[in-house]
């Protein structure tokens, strides 16, 4: 089941990220970079700021257990939904949870008459294949300097709704 979160529930996103990231990114980036990015992107102040700027957060939940999450933003002027975050607990991958969260964003895009979804994903992330299988295409390579000598080496991918 997918539930949208309120501002007071954003700690759930931080808690999930701290569980998911160290395992999911261990072969892509260093543990130091993982720690840096978690502190930068998933602290409560940053999550609240993003929420106030229009980012929506939703979790995938079974019984009382949170198994994954998505963050997205509707960009009406560009007729686009930007998926900022989509993560599933490593023990729950390949069970359709990621597809369910992605379908959730696609459905929101259709309801809001958006033309496409886009997202950024690390170029070495196995999720690239998941997105391609789902109908996303690679638009460009992006190398973003995020400070402290770290870079995000991503693909920007898009999906036409």
Where are these regions (language model features)?
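Residues forming the Rossmann-fold NAD(P)(H) cofactor-binding site
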Residues: 99
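Active-site acidic-Proline motif in GNAT/NAT acetyltransferases
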Residues: 89-95, 123
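Conserved catalytic-core motifs of GNAT/GCN5-like acyltransferases
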Residues: 118-122, 132, 137-155
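Conserved hydrophobic/aromatic "anchor" residues
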Residues: 69, 92, 114, 130-131, ...
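Acetyl-CoA-dependent GNAT
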Residues: 4-91, 102-104, 108, 112, ...
